[in-house]
Curated annotation (Swiss-Prot):
Substrate binds at D21, L22, N23, R36, H59, L60, G61, R62, R113, R146. This is Phosphoglycerate kinase. Pathway: Carbohydrate degradation; glycolysis; pyruvate from D-glyceraldehyde 3-phosphate: step 2/5. Belongs to the phosphoglycerate kinase family. InterPro entries: Phosphoglycerate_kinase (IPR001576), Phosphoglycerate_kinase_CS (IPR015911), Phosphoglycerate_kinase_N (IPR015824), Phosphoglycerate_kinase_sf (IPR036043). Its EC number is 2.7.2.3. GO terms for cellular component: cytosol. The lineage of its organism: Bacteria, Pseudomonadati, Pseudomonadota, Gammaproteobacteria, Oceanospirillales. It comes from Marinomonas sp. (strain MWYL1). ATP binds at K197, E314, G340, G341, D342, T343. The keyword Transmembrane helix does not apply. One of its GO terms (biological process) is glycolytic process.
Length: 387
């Protein structure tokens, strides 16, 4: 993959516009998980230390496009970055007509999704963004799969368009895991629906030696194998696809599960064999026997791709499975990549960030890369590098 790298561009006294993925959870005006912010900091610091006039942009949530909505303001993010850097980080609300910023100074510009035309990759909006800078840095792997004004259009029109260190590292790590993986290779795909991850499951089924499924996805596979799933979330219409996947690749199913009769923080957890799930039961985690069996597979693996928890780990009584797999990944001697929002929250919760080889900040982009799709923002950087 040939793109211009930010580290090879002279940034001194240049107006540098960096697109980061700072779409973090915010509650009561405070950032509750800052993994994506911390991942972006080295890029921001590198630009500041080079003497650049640094403007950072990102989206947050899904506001109504073209309208300011306070709950989606990046103010909590600006405050959080200021705390981490130990310097003021002003948030600029009306920024498309120009931003005042000095060399060595950082400003955050307000949520890109407040601008009409962002999602449609509007050309006029893209040109306004490009006019703000001498150098555009695409560093948001998490949005690289979307052709939008702040990820794709601006890269087309900026004087120089390059990849930031975070984006470059993401692409290198994913290529290492997918192009020439060390064997045996395992993947964990969790989440609520097979329908949203079907292409990922199909793509990985051709590559991996073991495909571990979790969450609501696993319930569809259990149903396909003839196990009772009670009132669990599952997709009956996708049972044929689940059967086809099980026929062509090794998808170990949990021999035991953790069930409850209600989905609630105080729900009582009961461990049952997979064959004994009752009509009123909801499967909310894999059981201890399954967790131990899957953990053993992971500890033997030389390459691990982890996307999605295997249970409702937000409630501790349904977090045992995800914790066991997280610890197995941490203990594995192989190359491991974790990606996707819920996955990052699990990495945080079980404090294994330092033991995972690479933590991908991308959710959808991570999955699309795994599927083998072209990421529009990366394709644009490649095309600019050639010209």
């Amino acid at each position: 993959m040939t793109v211009i790298n930010m580290k090879d561009v002279d940034l001194a006294n240049k107006r540098v516009l960096i697109r980061e993925d700072l779409n973090v959870p915010v509650k009561d005006g405070k950032v509750t998980s800052d993994a994506r912010i911390r991942a972006a900091l080295p890029t921001i610091k590198m630009a500041l230390e080079a003497g650049a006039k640094v403007m950072v942009m990102s989206h947050l949530g899904r506001p109504t496009e073209g309208q300011y909505e306070e709950e989606y303001s990046l103010q909590p993010v600006a405050t959080h970055i200021a705390g981490l850097l130990g310097q003021d980080v002003p948030l600029v609300k009306d920024w498309l007509d120009g931003v005042e910023v000095e060399s060595g100074q950082l400003v955050l510009v307000e949520n890109v999704r407040f601008n009409l035309g962002e999602k449609k990759d509007d050309e006029a909006l893209s040109k306004k963004m490009a006019a703000l800078c001498d150098v555009f840095v695409m560093d948001a792997f998490g949005t690289a799969h979307r052709a939008q004004a702040s990820t794709h259009g601006v890269a087309k029109f900026a004087p120089i368009a390059c990849a930031g260190p975070l984006l470059s590292a993401e692409l290198e790590a994913l290529e290492k895991a997918l192009a020439k993986p060390a064997r045996p290779m395992a993947a964990i795909v969790g989440g609520s629906k097979v329908s949203t991850k079907l292409t990922v499951l199909e793509s990985l089924s051709d590559k991996v030696d073991q495909l571990i499924v979790g969450g609501g996805i696993a319930n569809t596979f259990l149903a396909a194998a003839g196990f009772p799933v009670g009132k669990s979330l599952y997709e009956e219409d996708l049972i044929p696809q689940a059967k086809a996947l099980m026929a062509k690749t090794s998808i170990p199913l949990p021999e035991d599960v953790v069930v409850a009769t209600a989905f609630a923080p105080d729900a009582v957890a009961t461990v049952k064999d997979a064959a004994d799930v009752g009509p009123d039961d909801m499967i909310l985690d894999i059981g201890p026997k399954a967790a131990a069996a899957f953990a053993a597979l992971l500890e033997e693996s030389q390459t691990i791709i982890w996307n999605g928890p295997v249970g409702v780990f937000e409630f501790d009584q349904f977090g045992g499975g995800t914790k066991a797999l997280a610890m197995a990944i941490a203990n594995s001697k192989g190359f491991s990549i974790a990606g996707g929002g819920d996955t990052l929250a699990a990495v945080d919760k079980y404090d294994i960030a330092d033991q995972v080889s690479y933590i991908s900040t991308g959710g959808g982009a991570f999955l699309e890369f795994v599927e083998g799709k072209v990421l529009p923002a990366v394709a644009m950087l490649e095309s600019r590098a050639q010209n």
